[in-house]
A protein has these predicted regions:
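Glycine-rich, basic loop-to-helix element that forms the pyrophosphate-binding segment
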Residues: 1
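Active-site-adjacent helix/loop segment of glycosyltransferases
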Residues: 126, 130-194
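A short, conserved alpha-helix in the catalytic core of glycosyltransferases
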Residues: 82-85, 89-141
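Conserved donor NDP-sugar-binding/catalytic core segment of glycosyltransferases
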Residues: 13-49
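Short, flexible, basic/aromatic active-site loop/helix in glycosyltransferases
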Residues: 54-90
Length: 194
């Protein structure tokens, strides 16, 4: 059987050597269950896809408030203050491109069937992070066209909202001690002091 599985959005582009680079990294790091490469927009701008485990406020600010109002919150949530040229152990890696160790998937479980698109990546990354390292690896890169269907389509927005509600119902809305502990540890490791 396969050692690794790749789950990716249809709007992802990458060079053939990307998969080999990620597999080599995973082969050398048996404690890593999931890895995400550096992600760029087609115009070369970086996508900030390393994130803290979200609070309800993080997702509301990010989705519904004007960018300027949520700037400080977004910088912290998306770890924009950190060096995106360095490897990091991140609890929430974007679902746009998930490179997963099959053995780890068997241990933590597959995608939770309650989530159909949106929220499933947060849930799986979190479960994986509890038992394995979940690494951002800038030694490989991809291009994500970022179609952002839930920003353009009312039906997709409603699915997004429903699944985020399901995520918080599963893990906790405001009183999630595990989230608080994981996020505090990561911010400390990244020397966040604002």
């Amino acid at each position: 059987g396969a050692k690794y599985h790749v789950v990716l959005n249809p709007d992802i582009r990458f060079a053939p050597e990307t998969i080999e680079s990620l597999a080599c990294y995973m082969d050398a790091h048996e404690d890593v269950g999931q890895i995400m490469p550096k992600v760029f927009y087609p115009d070369g701008r970086l996508q900030y896809l390393c994130k803290l485990l979200p609070t309800p406020a993080d997702l509301i600010f990010r989705r519904f408030l004007p960018t300027g109002w949520a700037k400080k919150s977004r910088e912290r949530f998306e770890l924009r203050f950190s060096d995106y040229d360095k490897e990091k152990n991140i609890p929430f890696l974007s679902g746009c491109f998930m490179f997963l160790r099959v053995e780890a998937l068997c241990k933590v479980g597959l995608f939770d069937e309650r989530f159909f698109m949106y929220g499933e990546d947060i849930d799986l990354s979190r479960r994986m992070h509890l038992q394995y390292r979940t690494m951002y690896y800038p030694g490989a890169s991809i291009v994500h066209l970022h179609e952002a269907a839930s920003y353009k389509n009312r039906r997709m927005l409603l699915i997004h909202i429903r699944n985020i509600i399901r995520y918080f119902n599963k893990w906790g809305w405001f009183f999630d001690a595990q989230r608080r502990k994981i996020n505090r540890r990561l911010l400390k490791d990244l020397n966040y002091n604002r």
